Amino acid sequence: MRESVRKVLVIGSGPIKIAEAAEFDYSGSQALKALKEEGIETILVNSNVATVQTSRKFADKLYMIPVTWWAVEKVIERERPDGIMVGFGGQTALNVGVDLYNKGILQKYGVKVLGTPIEGIERALSREKFRETMINVGLPVPPSLSARSEEEALEKARQIGYPVMVRVSFNLGGRGSIVAWNEEELKRDIGRALSQSYIHEVLIEKYLHHWIELEYEVMRDKYGNSAVIACIENLDPMGVHTGESTVISPCQTLDNKEFQDMRFMSMDVAKSIDLVGECNVQFALDPKGYNYYVIETNPRMSRSSALASKATGYPLAYVSAKLALGYSLYEVLNKVSGSTCACFEPSLDYVVIKIPRWDLDKFENVEISLASEMKSVGEVMSIGRSFEESLQKAVRMLDIGEPGVVGGKIYFSKMTKEDALKNLKMRRPYWFLYAAKAFKEGATIDEVYEVTGINKFFLNKIKALVEFYEILRKQRNIDKDTLLQAKKLGFSDLQLAKALGVKESDIRKLREKWNIEPKVKQIDTLAGEWPAVTNYLYLTYNGTEDDIEFSEAGNKLLIIGAGGFRIGVSVEFDWSVVSLLDSSLKYFNDIAILNYNPETVSTDWDIARKLYFDEISVERVLDLIRKEKFTYVATFTGGQIGNNISKKLEEEGIRLLGTSGRSIDTAEDREKFSKLLDKLGIKQPEWISARSLEEVKEFISKVGYPVLIRPSYVLSGAAMKIVNNDLELMEYLKRATEVSPEHPVVISKYLNDAIEAEIDAAGDGKGVYGVVIEHVEEAGVHSGDATMSIPYRKLSSNVVNKMKENVHMIVRELEIKGPFNVQFVIKNNEPYIIELNLRASRSMPFSSKVVSKNIISLALDGILNGFGVDEFIELKPKSWGVKSPQFSWAQLKGAYPFLGPEMKSTGEAASLGTDFYDALLKSWLSSSPNKIPNKEGIALVYGTTNVEYLKIAAKNLIDYGITVYTLSEASIGIEEKSINDIIELIKNRKVEIVVTDGYLKHIDYEVRRIAVDYNIPIILNGRLGAEVTRAFSHPNVTYYEISEYGAGI
């Protein structure tokens, strides 16, 4: 029986941060679809401008405002919904729901919580209440005690005995959690742990060293019916956060009794918290005996549930939303299979592996070892019919330059067995690569198990891959049976070519000669045990026939996704994929998506006519084209991966949709692009190609420091650096040339004190439609970390006209057809071009939604029909839009927070306003942990660069009414405090905000680090600080639906 609700408010998760990523775009979108099917009016609160769900096709009304209780209350007051869903926006949404309930706001306006009740959520998320609940229902938990102060935590740890695990209540991604082996370690980190808890509570738990970690995904309706959708086995043992673990489904090493016992216990956990919808239950299993504990539960859609949904083909978020409306599991149809109800538990005839992706090399001083705090920024999911096939595919999907488990950089490095074992013991990311290296150098299974705790079942599989590869290398030739066996084990053509000393194309020719090709298999949730036809597909060599017939209809399109997220490639590229798909329906008979990211909307079952959940490579695209005969391949939505394969695809005779591979190569190669600008007479900073040290020194003696090193074919400023002296130059030039050794590195003069701006645009080879965007921070801060404004504020009309002329010239010269982005620096009223990206850009969802024109859709029209103009037409907004970066400093233990030309933010938020400061304030507040400072607290403002702006920020804060100090070691001329004084103030929770600028690690490392560890807002740029602090006193902050600002698409 459905709940009698007419209007439902859905709370989103806000900007992407470590441990709260695009899985909530997927889950929130599915919830909105489920509500719309019921004829229910939907209101969405979400400030994540990059997501698919913040497009008009999902919610009836959209508020891009901070996801906080006080902002959501304004929406409730305006819209008067009768229901609210808080389980589809991660921990952020749950915290907002709990606050709204505990403050009496939901009761005041008569808003019903749909799904799991708030009391159940609190029982799950408070470590103490959860422990008590488990004990009351007779479920085993590890020895543990809760604490709310540092002294209490130390006392409880003494009672339990070291080592202990500190778990944080009302928290995500294990933020602040630690393993302490002694009291000294606990004393050092417990203050940070308590600061990361929403309710200032931690659980001191006996540490279960090397125990196996398992997860069960449970659905439960309000009538008490339950179904276990997936069992996920973590290959990494307890102590490594599940978000950091390599995981596999179905579970491989459990016997039937173990599996069934924990299956029933997971349903008991769901019952104990009155779950309605979906939850994830985590267990610890003793590898040396039959003993297990319940660890925790997440009473909401989560990263694991998104993975389980994509792994099994069971639409968890959709079903969960239906259950929240009051339906039973028996009443809900599984729309993937189309033939079973939601009470059917999935059965798998394949193996799914998820591997996280880290970008730790972008951060200085960050702790590299994997532990109980999540640090990964994305993940990949592979599907195969053997562990080996699935694992090797997953390694390639990571896009870290490794061709598989064996045969890559680490495998052929000079690392000794002892070095490999040391890296394994340290828990460096991508342990399987070090395990393979250790086996290559003679390590035994027992030696690797001793330092990792990873089940020997998996280690034996990796060792067998090493042995097979080494035999291949010695043979230097291959027969038909061996080639087929290699492909079944997940070896790529490139991997085999390297082993045999031949070209990749030679292996492909052999496969074609011997008719060795992958088969297309479908995921139907039922392992073929029940009739079903699905569009959810993967490729495997462990099959004898294709599960589907291939359409001969012409005019077919393959859209390349962006793969696993990393810094610089996030949900904005998935928005581009879905936008292109929606826009292509009127042009193409058959459209398929190739992607492998389990977090995304584009990999959902009801988005494309066909979804190929598989690796993105030239080999795989050619396999698909051979079967499907696609007319076009679209690579411009695939981020850097798409651009990197575009030229090779074109060389293979594949037709690219939009701009040619030759033009993409010109734009991506820094030297070729710089020469193009010279040819067109377009200004750019002085530059030289770094081919020899002598040339570099000659150039620098001419232009002087600072200079900017810019490698080719990279995204998010990888290995890009401003250098100020010879020592820095030598250090970073080495790093840059390692990024892209086959392409020259360009060194250019860095323009100090310049404005940065960019243009998002669509071209048809002649005409251009574009949006001009201005950065708040000066040039030198990566565009992905910059605060952006539409419309521009400081640029003169003369400068903007020159920018538009330059862009128009480039479009004509390169015959740009499709979406693209051009970046400028403006110095002395002269625009200089610094970069051209011939693909969808990070900022395109923002610019499209602010000007109310989908640039991807516009670009497709230009590609296929043309614009009929030969000029630059500027798209302008009806209101102000500001986009702010989201940083995840608190998750990156030890990292030094600073901004530069290499991107460090993990997400973005945006808001609209009637003026710049209206939009800026809401946008900045949308990024965690930003908040309006309490006037009874203290602000800290200091720095040695942008000092005039820091002084403005200090004055604004004083006028606002808060006490302001500066750091005596980097003073701006107001009342000073020493570093030790400031650290004590932060620890005593007196500091409300920190505003600083520049790179001062030798002075203020401790100050910046403890500020983020204690969840204090920190602004790392003086110009932004001056603007945000002015916005604190802005009198007219609006909270309107986006259409009231004339925005949205």
From Swiss-Prot:
Residues 131-325, 674-864 form the ATP-grasp domain. Binds 4 Mg(2+) or Mn(2+) ions per subunit. Belongs to the CarB family. GO terms for biological process: 'de novo' UMP biosynthetic process; glutamine metabolic process; L-arginine biosynthetic process. One of its GO terms (molecular function) is carbamoyl-phosphate synthase (ammonia) activity. Mn(2+) 2 binds at residues 296, 298. It comes from Sulfurisphaera tokodaii (strain DSM 16993 / JCM 10545 / NBRC 100140 / 7) (Sulfolobus tokodaii). The gene is carB. InterPro entries: ATP-grasp, ATP_grasp_subdomain_1, CarbamoylP_synth_lsu, CarbamoylP_synth_lsu_oligo, CarbamoylP_synth_lsu_oligo_sf, CbamoylP_synth_lsu-like_ATP-bd, CbamoylP_synth_lsu_CPSase_dom, MGS-like_dom. Keywords: Amino-acid biosynthesis, Arginine biosynthesis, ATP-binding, Ligase, Magnesium, Manganese, Metal-binding, Nucleotide-binding, Pyrimidine biosynthesis, Repeat. This is Carbamoyl phosphate synthase large chain. ATP 2 binds at residues 710, 749, 751, 756, 780-783, 823, 835. Large subunit of the glutamine-dependent carbamoyl phosphate synthetase (CPSase). CPSase catalyzes the formation of carbamoyl phosphate from the ammonia moiety of glutamine, carbonate, and phosphate donated by ATP, constituting the first step of 2 biosynthetic pathways, one leading to arginine and/or urea and the other to pyrimidine nucleotides. Its EC number is 6.3.4.16, 6.3.5.5. It is an enzyme of class 6 (ligase). Mg(2+) 4 binds at residues 835, 837. ATP 1 binds at residues 127, 167, 173-174, 206, 208, 213, 239-241, 282, 296.
